[in-house]
Curated annotation (Swiss-Prot):
Self-association and partners: Interacts with host ent-kaurene oxidases OSKO1, OSKO2, OSKOL4 and OSKOL5; this interaction.
Keyword Methyltransferase in annotation: no
Family: Belongs to the phytoreovirus minor outer capsid protein P2 family.
Compartment(s) of residence: Virion; Host cytoplasm
Protein name (database record): Minor outer capsid protein P2
Chain ranges of the PPPDE domain: 929-1148
Coiled coil ranges: none
Role, per record: Minor capsid protein present in the outer capsid, which is required for adsorption of the virus onto host insect cells (Potential). Could play a role in the host plant virus induced dwarfism.
Residues at the catalytic site: H953, C1111
Top-level taxon in the UniProt lineage: Viruses
GO cellular component: host cell cytoplasm; viral outer capsid
A molecular function GO annotation: peptidase activity
UniProt keyword list: Capsid protein, Host cytoplasm, Host-virus interaction, Outer capsid protein, Virion
Source organism of this protein record: Rice dwarf virus (isolate O) (RDV)
């Protein structure tokens, strides 16, 4: 449409265009002085063009959904900006779409944070504690700059401070160029600059531009990653040295050479925000905030007591549900709001549902983008030439400056020559030492080859390498020598003392048993010997292959379906080997967590090894050094023989050549000094190619060759060879750091097997038309008000507006449950039944109450409890009389507390000290309990509670009310770690309620219980504590629960009653306690007694651990036992659990 140019002022324009689309935005700009008459025409023209683009986008989005709502498409295509009514609806849709997109970005950001959680961060939400806008909320800042930043759990872990950078903060409120700068110790730590004209954001960390993002919401497509939060992490170790990490959607950077002092654990941040303008309508502003953010619930931990993968599954599952619960609640409100706005108009219900369809598509797209998907890849390798093994050899030099001496023993003999007579020989061995000090800096093989392969996900490169472990380990090698044929080394010559000069001894070295026979002379040294390092017998020769899976999710792993074959050529002989690929999660040198395939095959399985010689190259300064190396002992050369004849003695001198024995010895301090060695450039290597031979199974490494029994070896990966692998893709490709390696191989097999269920759900719920019909029925005025109640009854997980999303979420939870059956205590048959029930419920809301149908009529009552039954139950113990104490106690102050079912109660145990952080946590938990918390507070507390790492003590309160004649009896069973009487072995002395626990038998921890029973004959809530004997607890147990030492003489009945009532008083006074989880359950007859007997029998099996098996994990197990009949396999015996079930059946 055309816009007039003859208006007198901006206010005339306002009056003319007050009904145009986006009028609120236009009015705001006029009032702020951002619109002038001169540029108004251009602005409105651009606005109309943008509106038309939005209309086209909405139409395309609906077409891409493949839904059968032709009427909606036709009506939408008729919408024009000149139609005020239609334009208003379009504007509402447009606003809804933008809100949904923002929610989707938020969801994507949370999934990114999940990846951090999966790798060792116990994470709550990441929210903008440091607001970027000048008018931002500063309520989340700590007031004082001197704040104790102790780790919540203990002081043994590294300290993390996380600063989020949220691009979404700049999208709708920034109308000028803006900069935000964060300082550490007076230096600029990072800065964020937004250019309004191009809506581009630049992030600089320590002076380096780390990323650039486009923040425009208008265009053909929106890139979710541009709106995902980035994290700046400062990690302080125990030595107070800080490291700086920057995590974005695409990469992670670790800044080296930069450190921060953090010795006093106080604030190091000064945050300044500067706003500069391009016009003079907004004055320059400056805002400074001093302080530090809250720790945001993020701590490094190492799980104990259970496997790491168990924690991964729990964190992933609970966080997905929490996040989607928030998204679902927002969308239900939007859906109802749109319906209310248009119910009186002529628009069809299909028109009304348009925004819901967009919501569904947006969230499905976000979930698909953030949820790991199963990928089945076949990697096929191209043809390769034969590679000499020496060209892909990598040797690790393990010599140090201290490893200077290597010793060996060479065989030799001594030959004594005479001018007359026969020569005499004496065999001996000569000890030779090698001064290896120069080997530390020697040049060794460091080669590999990349072989190109092609897969369904693109090109893959396989790195091929030969490894010989310990080849340069001074503890595993000796020095040996290679000799030329017929070689003899004249080591030294000596003459016996007093002997004629023609009698002498020559010491010679002969070929040692382990030496190699060279057919051609090899002369790198003057003494004709070529030294080498000889590895031990049976040293493996490993062919290592590595393939990186860059698009995989490291925490979920993968599974190799089929390996391939490679060949080793030895002359005319060819040996075939099968690869042994395994899936490994590792952290790269850049700190990125990755997944790769690794195969390692030992070729000595078919080519056995007696020795491996790594030949050195002789250097000019290499030489043998020795002192007086040979010594011949003195001989009495004037020895004579005598003969007596009669009275005469005849003497005859002995000839020199008749001396038959000489003592010749070798000195042990002969040393070889090789100098600095280049193992990759041995001289005269050609003799190994043609003339080398040996009779033993020997490997000799010379330059680019590895000889086996005198013949070089070659490797081949045949053309067309392929491997099959299944893994889970990581669309967001989020990097992580400081990960722990879960047992991914076991998880992966279960996950891959469960993928068929995910596909079947998508197929079952793909008919969007049926979903629309169901939604239209729900949108009838008589039932519209039930939407919030229906969603609430499902727990906020599945929205009827997006059933496919709900089904996928449930599938994720099911897959993760299957991935760790030991932790979940389930069998696959029950999982399948539960999974199908959830999917059916996601498609059509069939029941007003409850979720699951187990197909067991006796136990079905535990699947649901109608709200009206709870509401109609008036006889609750509001006031409890304690006759022995002469007191009455009023039940807790929580308005939504119900004396039916199961409560998980949390108490502050001062784990955070007594400072502001502890006070903030108690205040926040109280707000969550009373439904007064904001989203971020609620998400923080519930995320930690769902992960069972909330820094509080948890116990379970199980309440059952029965009417016996005219008497109402309420039984309250309290159970928890170190609560009441310890149920195995020694007894704990512990105080219940809001008191501190006092341990009396060391630091061992285990389950305990206390049973409180009250009765009433009225319906006004006045109850009276029964006699302690009715509870079935012994005197000893009651004294233990009261924290008292049992007296040497049995106490009186009245004394025990006094203690019993005091415990009931402490337990029923709920000051300082918080009920964060309530379960509406009607326990079956006999179930409470059967449960008590079950935990008494198995309490000693519970192995307490601070993470993974703590008081909150125990509380979760108790709820599962009572409500889901799920056996915690790590501490409940199967026979005892079957007895528990049978006892309930017998009572029924």
């Amino acid at each position: 449409m055309a816009y007039p140019n003859d208006v007198r002022n901006v206010w005339d324009v306002y009056n003319v265009f007050r009904d145009v689309p986006n009028r609120e935005h236009l009015i705001r700009d006029i009032r702020n002085g951002l619109v002038t008459v001169r540029n108004l025409t251009n602005m409105l023209t651009n606005m109309e063009r943008d509106d038309q683009l939005i209309i086209a986008q909405l139409s395309n989005m609906m077409k891409s959904l493949s839904i059968g709502v032709e009427k909606a498409q036709n009506e939408l295509s008729k919408l024009k900006t000149t139609d005020a009514d239609r334009a208003a609806v379009l504007a509402a849709y447009q606003t809804s779409v933008l809100n949904i997109e923002r929610n989707t970005m938020l969801l994507t950001g949370y999934f990114k944070q999940l990846v951090l959680d999966l790798t060792g961060y116990v994470g709550a939400s990441v929210y903008p504690i440091l607001p970027f806008m000048i008018t931002g909320d500063q309520s989340m800042m700590v007031d004082s700059v001197k704040v104790n930043m102790k780790n919540v759990f203990d002081d043994k872990h590294e300290q993390e401070i996380v600063l989020p950078i949220h691009p979404a903060c700049f999208v709708s409120t920034i109308t000028e160029d803006t900069s935000s700068v964060v300082y550490a110790d007076g230096d600029e730590l990072y800065s964020v600059h937004v250019r309004h004209a191009t809506m581009t954001m630049y992030v600089n960390v320590l002076g380096e531009t780390v990323e650039t993002r486009q923040l425009s919401m208008i265009g053909e497509s929106i890139v979710p990653d541009d709106f995902a939060p980035s994290l700046l992490i400062l990690r302080f170790s125990q030595d107070s040295v800080g490291e700086v990490f920057y995590l974005s959607h695409g990469n992670m950077k670790k800044f080296l050479g930069y450190s921060l002092e953090y010795t006093d654990k106080c604030s190091i941040f000064d945050v300044a925000r500067r706003v500069s303008t391009t016009r003079n309508t907004i004055p320059n502003g400056f805002c400074s905030v001093d302080g530090v953010p809250y720790l945001d619930g993020r701590f490094i931990y190492q799980p104990s007591g259970v496997s790491a993968d168990s924690n991964i599954c729990a964190i992933y599952n609970s966080y997905v549900l929490d996040t989607l619960r928030y998204i679902t609640e927002c969308e239900v409100d939007t859906l109802r709001s749109v319906y209310d706005q248009t119910s009186s108009t002529s628009f069809s219900k299909t028109d009304v549902l348009t925004s819901s369809l967009l919501t569904m598509q947006s969230n499905i797209s976000a979930l698909s983008a953030a949820t790991p998907q199963l990928a089945n890849d076949v990697i096929t390798f191209d043809s390769t030439d034969l590679l000499s093994l020496g060209t892909v050899l990598t040797v690790s030099n393990e010599f140090t400056a201290d490893d200077t001496i290597l010793s060996t023993s060479l065989a030799g003999h001594c030959q004594v020559d005479y001018s007359e007579g026969s020569p005499q020989d004496k065999s001996m061995s000569i000890s030779v030492s090698c001064d290896s000090s120069q080997l530390v800096s020697s040049t060794v093989h460091s080669y590999s080859a990349d072989i190109l392969g092609h897969g369904l996900k693109g090109d893959r490169t396989m790195n091929l390498m030969i490894n010989v472990p310990g080849l340069m380990n001074p503890q595993k090698v000796t020095v040996d020598y290679v000799y030329s044929d017929g070689y003899k080394l004249n080591f030294a010559s000596v003459v016996a003392p007093g002997a004629p000069f023609w009698i002498n001894a020559t010491l010679q070295l002969s070929v040692s048993p382990s030496a190699h026979n060279m057919l051609s002379k090899l002369t790198p040294l003057d003494n004709d010997a070529c030294p080498g390092l000889k590895a031990q017998a049976n040293t493996p020769i490993l062919v290592s292959m590595t393939i990186n899976l860059d698009d995989a999710t490291p925490a979920l792993g993968g599974e190799v379906i089929q390996n391939c074959v490679f060949k080793i050529h030895h002359g005319d002989d060819v040996y075939s080997f099968v690869t042994d690929f395994d899936v490994v999660s590792y952290t790269s040198t850049s700190g990125t967590n990755c997944l790769k395939l690794i195969s390692s095959v030992d070729i000595t399985s078919q080519l056995p090894s007696d020795m491996v010689i790594y030949v050195m190259n002789g250097s000019p300064d290499a030489a043998f050094t020795s002192g007086d190396s040979v010594n011949m002992s003195s001989v009495d050369w004037h020895q004579s023989t005598s003969q007596t004849v009669g009275n005469y003695v005849y003497t005859t001198m002995k000839a020199y050549w008749n001396v038959t024995s000489y003592d010749v010895e070798a000195r042990p301090y002969t040393t070889y000094v090789p100098g600095k060695v280049n193992f990759t450039a041995v001289e005269h290597a050609d003799v190994f190619v043609d003339d080398y031979n040996t009779g033993v199974n020997s490997y000799v490494i010379v330059n680019s060759r590895i000889y086996y029994k005198g013949t070089p070896l070659y490797i081949e990966v045949p053309s067309g060879s392929f491997i099959k692998v299944s893994y889970f893709t990581s669309p967001l490709k989020n990097p992580t750091v400081d990960t722990y390696n879960a047992e991914i191989s076991r998880n992966s097999a279960y996950l891959i097997k469960a993928n068929a269920s995910l596909d079947s759900v998508a197929t079952m719920l793909n008919n969007i038309s049926n979903r629309i019909d169901a939604m239209e029925r729900l949108m009838e005025p008589t039932r519209a008000q039930q939407i919030a109640g229906v969603v609430s009854s499902i727990g906020g997980v599945i929205s009827l507006g997006m059933p496919l999303l709900g089904a996928i979420v449930v599938t994720i939870g099911t897959i993760i449950s299957i991935a760790d059956p030991d932790k979940q205590g389930i069998d696959y048959h029950s999982v399948a039944n539960a999974f199908m029930s959830w999917c059916q419920y996601a498609a059509v809301c069939r029941y007003e109450y409850g979720l699951l149908k187990r197909g067991d009529e006796k136990l079905d009552v535990l699947s649901f409890m109608p709200k009206r039954v709870v509401s109609d139950f008036k006889n609750k113990p509001d006031v409890i009389s304690l006759p022995e104490l002469g007191e009455s106690v009023l039940r807790g102050s929580s308005t939504d507390y119900l004396d039916t079912g199961i409560n998980i109660i949390y108490n502050d145990m001062q784990l955070l000290g007594q400072g502001k952080l502890s006070g903030w946590l108690n205040k926040t938990v109280s707000k969550v309990e009373n439904n007064a918390a904001n989203f971020f507070e609620r998400n923080l507390v519930k995320s930690l509670a769902n992960k069972e790492v909330l820094p509080m003590h948890a116990r379970v309160e199980i309440t059952q009310t029965e009417k016996i004649g005219d008497v109402y009896r309420t039984t309250i069973l309290y159970t928890g770690i170190n609560e009441g009487s310890y149920l195995g072995g020694d007894v704990f002395a512990s105080r219940l309620g809001d008191k501190n626990i006092l341990r009396m038998n060391g630091f061992e921890s285990g389950p305990g219980r206390f049973k409180a029973i009250v009765e009433s004959t009225t319906e006004v809530g006045n109850f009276r504590v029964v006699d302690w004997t009715v509870s079935g607890m012994s005197r000893y147990e009651i004294y233990a629960a009261a924290g008292e030492i049992y007296p040497s003489k049995d106490p009186s009945h009245a004394d025990v009653q006094l203690l019993y009532e005091s415990i009931v008083r402490d337990l029923t006074t709920r000051d300082g306690s918080f009920v964060l989880k309530h379960h509406d359950v009607l326990l079956l007859p006999g179930q409470l007694d059967a449960f008590e007997e079950l935990i008494i029998r198995n309490a000693s099996n519970y192995q307490y651990a601070f993470i993974g098996s703590n008081c909150q994990n125990y509380a979760h197990d108790v709820v599962d036992i009572l409500t889901k009949f799920k056996r915690p396999q790590r501490w409940i015996k199967d026979d005892d659990f079957k007895l528990y079930i049978q006892s309930i059946y017998d009572a029924l």
